[in-house]
């Protein structure tokens, strides 16, 4: 699996791995790259079955497999220890990595994540699946911003959204891969295992997230032994895109604090 690695800003700089959500594209993190690369060696990637890592996914494809293939790629790149920043599905992959490779994951950041899929989130995906079956890739792509962004943010950026739709349609991961990745997301359940995650965790959520209720992050916070929760009042599901200034400040401060906390505990 292909990874994109930024140059380390200094010798032995900590590594931060960015894991996007269901869309799978590493470019989702573009608003974070410049600030993170000043302090960390940053790893981005298109998830298997998407972008520059094309593949046909098995019907039983799982979050566990997503975590395993990423860890294998990191080890192959010579990376043994890393912090993980995961958005939605990416947060699930991050938790699986923390469970399966506790000696490797130094810090975990969960952005608009959950322990197991919420009934409201499931309802949203049911609607989106119906759109996919009835209207194909174009209907899925055109509906996606409604679940990602606040209405006023979208209304002020109509040309940008049209360009994003065209790009997403041109690079659509395919119906079968998308549904198999979505099914992996829906099957994931960390409610009985989260207390085994021992690395420090930062939880970031947006109170106006239409897709994932912020209560899901409260449940994560209650279940994860060494966690702190930060709430953005505005930003929607893709709060790192819509309000990068606020998000980046929370992320940078959180990473620095948790990495220092971990080093002090060793």
Curated annotation (Swiss-Prot):
Top enzyme class: hydrolase
Protein name, entry field: Putative carbamate hydrolase RutD
Keyword Hydrolase: yes
Gene Ontology molecular function: any one: hydrolase activity, acting on carbon-nitrogen (but not peptide) bonds, in linear amides
Induction: Up-regulated by the nitrogen regulatory protein C (NtrC also called GlnG) and repressed by RutR.
Protein's UniProt keywords contain Electron transport: no
The protein's Enzyme Commission number: 3.5.1.-
Record keywords: Hydrolase
Species name: Escherichia coli O157:H7
Function per UniProt: Involved in pyrimidine catabolism. May facilitate the hydrolysis of carbamate, a reaction that can also occur spontaneously.
């Amino acid at each position: 699996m292909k990874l994109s690695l930024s140059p380390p800003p200094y010798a032995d700089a900590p590594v931060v791995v960015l894991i996007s959500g269901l869309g799978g594209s590493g470019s989702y993190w573009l608003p974070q790259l410049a600030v993170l690369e000043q302090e960390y060696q940053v790893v981005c990637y298109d998830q298997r079955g998407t972008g520059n890592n094309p593949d046909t996914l098995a019907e039983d494809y799982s979050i566990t497999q997503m975590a395993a293939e990423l860890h294998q790629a990191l080890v192959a790149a010579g990376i043994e220890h890393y912090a993980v920043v995961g958005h939605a599905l990416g947060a699930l992959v991050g938790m699986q990595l923390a469970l399966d490779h506790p000696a490797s994951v130094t810090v975990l950041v969960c952005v608009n994540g959950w322990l197991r899929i919420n009934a409201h989130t499931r309802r949203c995906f049911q609607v989106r699946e119906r759109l996919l079956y009835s209207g194909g890739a174009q209907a899925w792509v055109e509906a996606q911003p409604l679940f990602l962004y606040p209405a006023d943010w979208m209304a002020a950026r109509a040309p940008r959204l049209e360009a994003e739709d065209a790009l997403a349609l041109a690079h659509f991961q395919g119906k079968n891969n998308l549904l198999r990745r979505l099914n992996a997301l829906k099957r994931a359940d960390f409610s009985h295992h989260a207390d085994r995650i021992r690395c420090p965790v930062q939880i970031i959520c947006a109170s106006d997230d239409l897709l994932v209720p912020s209560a899901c992050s409260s449940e994560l916070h209650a279940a994860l032994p060494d966690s702190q929760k930060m709430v953005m009042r505005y930003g929607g599901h893709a709060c790192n895109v819509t309000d990068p200034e606020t998000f980046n400040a929370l992320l940078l401060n959180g990473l620095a604090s948790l990495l220092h906390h971990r080093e002090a505990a060793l």
